[in-house]
Every structure is written in C-alpha cells, then in structure tokens.
C-alpha cells in the first residue's frame, strides 16, 4: 500500500482526493497496488471538511518528515515553501509528484540529483501540457532518438487571450478579464502573459530532449502584453493568426530556447 500526503488542499487537491477515492477499486486491478491519502497539509483547516480517516495538519513539513507517508504530492506552487518541502521529503526517502513547472525548471537539477542519491522517484508529468504525456514520451518513447527541435503552444492563457482578440475582436484587457472569469487565468496572470510560464515549460522539455541541465537562465522570453488589436487585425488580413509559442532547437551552434509571439 502506498500512503499519499497532499501538500495543499485547494481545488486541485480536493479533485485529486476525489479521483483517488473514485478509482479505489480499479487502480489495484490495473497495477496490482493500492493508493490511499493518509495525510493532508492545508492552511485553511477551519474552512473545510475532511475525511475522518485522514490526518490533517497546517504544517506541510509534518508530511515531509512523517513515517506514515510514502509519496508526497506537492500542490503548493511557487518555489519557496515547495522547494523546502520537496528537498526535505526526498531526504526522508519519499517519492515526489509535482506539477510545479517553476520548481522543476529552476531547481530540477538539484532535485533529481538528490532523488537519485536517495533512490526515490520524482514525477512531474503534469508540469508541461497537462494531461498530454509529453514528459513520458520524451523520457521513454524517444529516449534513443536525436531530437532536433520542439515547438508548440504551451501556455493556455496566452492562447485563449489571443484567440479571443482574433475571433471576438476583444481588446487585450477585455480578453484577459474574460480568461480570469472563466478560470483560464490566475488572479495574478503575470507569469502567463509575460512568457515566464512558457519559459519554464520549454526549459523542462529542452533539458529532457537534449539531456542537459535546465537552460532556464538562457531562455529568450517575450510575452503578449504588447500585442494590440491592430496587430491582430493586420495579421488576420494577411491570412495569419498570432500565437504565443515555446521553441527549442539544437544545432552546431548550440542549444536555443525561446518563447514569444509568432
């Protein structure tokens, strides 16, 4: 039996717990193993209800150090507390699951090295492209292939805003507000619209594809804040649609990583 500790119990954490409970009978039959959530760390304990069988604490470090936990699911976000939790958990021989692309892009090299020394697994599939298994594809299916380049739309917020500016003739600000209302953009969407989120993702993909350390510090970054309705109009008249993409390629000149509108 694998005992899971959820570090963070917001929308994603609650949905994950529900999913694990709903698949309680199918998971063991598919992989001959069982998973249960045994601990939750949540800053808002007084505002929520919890399963009585689950230990709840406000201190995430309790999970990282607990002998009752085998797997830490990091749902905190950011790189401050999340970093401390992940490093501490690995030192205590706990496997890690995280969709935190900032954490992986900025500290992945250190995390993976420490994980190898402690013989634990670090899963970060959802850090890039959500449910599309691109990490597994690059790591396993294409492990022996020589990848020359990767290009793609890797930030949903930018993609939605640009699509709304084009199809609905919305201004940038109106499209951004609509993205917030529909839950496609964070309350503070800075990392999305300035290109940082895409830079984190393309760094992760490049490090796997080319088997290098994270190239984040060398990524050329440009967001979509300066794109106007006039830009959209002219591109449409020429038969094009502006998109924000992440690009990485390798050549005799070296490895290039960039994220910008095209």
Model-flagged regions — what are they?
Residues 58-99:
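Rossmann-fold NAD(P) dinucleotide-binding segment
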Residues 1-4:
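Extreme N-terminal starter segment of soluble prokaryotic enzymes
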Residues 140-200, 205:
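Conserved anion/nucleotide-ligand pocket segment
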Residues 22-50:
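NAD(P)-binding Rossmann-fold cofactor-contacting core
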Residues 9:
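Glycine-rich Rossmann-fold phosphate-binding loop(s) that bind the pyrophosphate
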Residues 176-262:
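Substrate-binding/catalytic subdomain of NAD(P)-dependent oxidoreductase enzymes
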Residues 83-88, 101-139:
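Rossmann-fold NAD(P)-binding glycine/threonine-rich loop
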Residues 13-14:
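N-terminal Rossmann-fold NAD(P) dinucleotide-binding loop
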């Amino acid at each position: 039996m694998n005992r899971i500790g959820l570090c963070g119990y917001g929308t994603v954490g609650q949905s994950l717990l529900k999913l694990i409970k709903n698949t309680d009978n199918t998971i063991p039959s598919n992989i001959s193993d069982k998973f249960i959530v045994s601990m939750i760390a949540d800053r808002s304990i007084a505002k929520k209800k919890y399963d009585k069988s689950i230990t709840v604490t406000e201190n995430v470090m309790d999970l990282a150090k607990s002998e009752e936990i085998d797997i830490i699911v990091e749902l905190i976000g950011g790189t401050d507390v999340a970093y401390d939790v992940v490093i501490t958990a690995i030192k205590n021989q706990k496997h890690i699951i995280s969709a935190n692309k900032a954490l992986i892009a900025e500290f992945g090299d250190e995390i993976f090295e420490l994980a190898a020394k402690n013989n634990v697994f670090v899963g970060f599939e959802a850090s890039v492209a959500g449910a599309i298994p691109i990490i597994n594809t690059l790591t396993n299916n294409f492990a022996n292939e020589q990848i020359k380049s990767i290009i793609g739309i890797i930030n949903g917020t930018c993609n939605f805003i640009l699509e709304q500016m084009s199809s609905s003739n919305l201004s940038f600000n109106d499209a951004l507000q609509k993205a917030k209302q529909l839950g496609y953009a964070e309350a503070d969407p800075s990392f999305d619209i300035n290109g940082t989120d895409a830079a984190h993702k393309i760094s992760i993909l490049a490090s796997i594809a080319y088997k290098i350390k994270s190239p984040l510090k060398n990524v050329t970054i440009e967001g979509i804040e300066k794109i106007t309705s006039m830009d959209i109009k002219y591109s449409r008249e020429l038969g094009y649609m502006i998109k924000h993409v992440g690009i990485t390629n390798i050549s005799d000149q070296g490895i290039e990583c960039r994220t910008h509108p095209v």
